[in-house]
A protein has these predicted regions:
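Short acidic/polar active-site loop segments enriched in Thr and Asp
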Residues: 13-14, 79
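Active-site pocket-lining segments that scaffold enzyme catalytic pockets across diverse folds
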Residues: 15, 24
Length: 199
């Protein structure tokens, strides 16, 4: 609450926050929903139902999947569907999670904000799948791909190919330099990558 009030002093009127729903008690989601209600007349708080441990890699104490908990978060009042495909245990789980994100957003008429390709691996290409699915569903402007660090490592031929799809899909990007300038490139020798997406 103190942090939100400090942001408001700097003129911020809309804040989006990711609530980890792979805590089976949904502690952060419940707290953010309370804050959203309390501050609704002074700031717009958007909450992402976010599976930090993955939609299909996570299994809760009662057998619930991350995908089920994301959906529960949406039913409770979260504004956005979150995902983290590159963090799933295998590529297939990541791909499945992108399909689920778009399906849930369409089902509940929600926005999408995915931690997408936040890795140094130039072969992590979930932004391509997310963009294609958003384009097919006609929801591109409701989609945000956050981080997309792998695009900073991708070769020019692939990026040139991807650009046409990104333009057609009209998805949004959120670059996070304060995080990714120090999180990415840690395993590199020299020269070290900067870790931010292509801007």
């Amino acid at each position: 609450k103190i942090g939100i009030k400090k942001e408001m002093l700097h003129g911020v009127q809309l804040i989006r926050s990711h609530a980890d729903v792979t805590d089976p008690n949904l502690t952060s989601l419940k707290a953010l929903l309370e804050l959203k209600e309390e501050l609704k007349d002074t700031v717009t708080l958007q909450i992402v139902s976010f599976p930090q441990e993955g939609m299909y890699s996570y299994e809760g104490p009662h057998g619930e999947s991350g995908a089920e908990l994301v959906e529960e978060g949406l039913k409770m009042g979260a504004d956005c569907v979150g995902g983290i495909p590159h963090f799933e245990q295998c590529r297939e789980f990541g791909e499945h999670s992108m399909h689920t994100v778009v399906e849930l957003a369409s089902k509940y008429d929600k926005l999408i904000d995915v931690h997408c390709d936040e890795t140094d691996d130039p072969n992590s290409r979930y932004v391509e799948l997310l963009s294609a699915l958003a384009y097919k569903a006609g929801i591109g402007p409701k989609v945000t791909a956050s981080h997309t660090c792998s695009l900073g490592s991708a070769d020019n031929a692939y990026f040139f190919h991807l650009t046409k799809l990104l333009k057609a899909a009209h998805i949004n990007f959120a670059c996070a330099p304060t995080e990714n300038l120090y999180l990415q490139g840690r395993q590199d020798t020299f020269p070290k990558r900067r870790g931010i997406t292509r801007v």
